[in-house]
Regions:
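Short hydrophobic beta-strand element within catalytic cores of glycosyltransferases
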Residues: 309-312, 322
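A conserved mid-protein helix/loop that constitutes part of the nucleotide-sugar donor-binding site
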Residues: 17-18, 213, 217-236, 250-254, ...
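Acidic donor-binding loop of glycosyltransferase active sites
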Residues: 281-295, 308
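Conserved acidic donor-binding segment of nucleotide-sugar-dependent glycosyltransferases
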Residues: 324-325, 329-336, 345-351
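Short alpha-helical segment that forms part of, or immediately flanks, the ligand-binding pocket
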Residues: 277, 295, 300-305, 319-320, ...
């Protein structure tokens, strides 16, 4: 199959970028011809505020570049990942103008929330969910604490809602979990065209041993990731192993301070994927104490691949991905004493931990391998090719 894959890469590489790269590699390994179209957020600095806002709503350059690619290569499917801010929904119309079905993987909550997190002021927030215009987000400057940036993101959502883009220009939306699917539907996406396909890991890194005995956190060092809760819980523990924190972000100074005060806390900064996988495999457990809902962090699939159980906040997608007491443990979000109690369970009972390791690896083999993902993705492409969208735009020539 000939497939065009488009993605707007982030300034700070993260799990979403890795997911796209893994999916492209998996498609190529299965014999598909993949045409790649990329933008990178490093280019935003040269655009200026007005130029970036305009491109967020309708990127003329992405439209024309993609139109040319569609005409040259004639792919059977156009598969979009992140289109914000440099690709924009204009890309769908470039595909539609060439009668090419559109699949959109939704890696976050950007289509229903200006900051893509459903999170504000230290708490889960759904104030804009289902609104034609997300004015609460503008009032609170939810995206980058900027009125201009939030207004641009909100305008993009509102303009394309008014144009019917979300309803008519996309054949299939791919949510990463059932929880995320439900939130996207609450936000206005057509239920019959939102399907679920989880993240996966390719190639399979193989199980680790857990022999390191430490706890590891991997991710962006920011408030929504629950680092305050993790550090508070760590202070409540009696005898404790090492806590390795891998990543960078706005809370780096606070993490560094915690490491200076407690020699069991180690901040390792950002690490390449190979080192991250090794750290996960040797850990007793992976920590995911997020205050926000999360969607499907790739690091969870990586932990399961290595046979490492996950201790996570028991809300949002995590409550559906992690089987409590089987592939990991869930604690009450933001509750440091409850998290400390769950860590004590993990650390005190090697037999339970061994069973969890086996269960986590089995969950990976069952649901998160490249083979399982490829089967699901092919079914999604068949759905898109089968004309699953009765409201679909007819081929148009849009010259904005």
């Amino acid at each position: 199959m000939d497939i065009l894959v488009a993605h707007n890469f982030y300034k700070q590489p993260g799990g979403e970028d890795q997911c796209v790269a893994a999916e492209v590699a998996m498609l190529k390994a299965h014999g598909h011809n993949v045409i790649e179209y990329h933008c990178h957020n490093d280019a935003t600095e040269a655009l200026g505020r007005m130029g970036l806002a305009s491109r967020t709503i309708w990127s003329r350059s992405a439209f024309y570049e993609l139109r040319q690619l569609f005409r040259t290569h004639r792919p059977q499917i156009a598969h979009f990942h992140n289109t914000f801010p440099l690709i924009s929904p204009a890309a769908y119309y470039a595909a539609r103008g060439n009668n090419i079905p559109v699949v959109q993987t939704v890696h976050n909550f950007r289509l229903v929330c200006a900051n893509a997190l459903l999170f504000r002021s230290g708490r889960v927030c759904e104030d804009c969910l289902g609104k034609a215009i997300g004015w609460p987000g503008i009032v609170h400057k939810c995206y980058r604490n900027s009125l201009g940036a939030t207004s641009a993101a909100t305008a993009m959502l509102g303009v394309h809602r008014a144009m019917g883009t979300w309803r008519r220009a996309v054949d299939v939306y791919v949510a990463l979990t059932e929880f995320s699917r439900n939130k996207l539907i609450e936000g206005g996406l057509p239920a019959e065209r939102v399907v679920v396909k989880s993240n996966f890991v390719y190639p399979d890194p193989g199980p680790g041993s857990g022999a390191g005995g430490y706890i590891v956190f991997i991710g962006r060092l920011s408030a929504e990731k629950g680092l305050e809760t993790l550090l508070d819980a760590w202070r409540l523990l009696g005898r404790k192993p090492r806590l390795k924190i891998i990543g960078d972000g706005p809370m780096a100074a606070k993490v560094k301070e915690a490491a200076q005060k407690d020699d069991t806390v180690q901040w390792l900064g950002s690490k390449p994927l190979e080192a991250v996988l090794e750290s996960i495999g040797e850990a007793a457990a992976l920590m995911l104490p997020s205050q926000c809902y999360e969607n499907f962090p790739r690091v969870v699939a990586e932990a399961f691949a290595k046979g490492t159980p996950v201790v996570a906040s028991g809300h949002g997608a995590m409550a559906t991905i992690i089987s409590n007491g089987y592939t990991g443990l869930l604690f009450r979000p933001g509750d440091a004493p409850d998290l400390a109690e769950k860590l004590e369970i993990i650390l005190a009972d090697p037999i339970t931990l061994s069973h969890m390791r086996q269960a986590a690896r089995a969950e990976f083999v069952r649901n998160f391998t490249a083979e399982a993902n490829h089967r699901t993705l092919m079914a999604i492409y068949e759905k898109a090719l089968g004309g699953s969208n009765p409201e679909a735009l007819r081929p148009v020539s849009c010259e904005w």
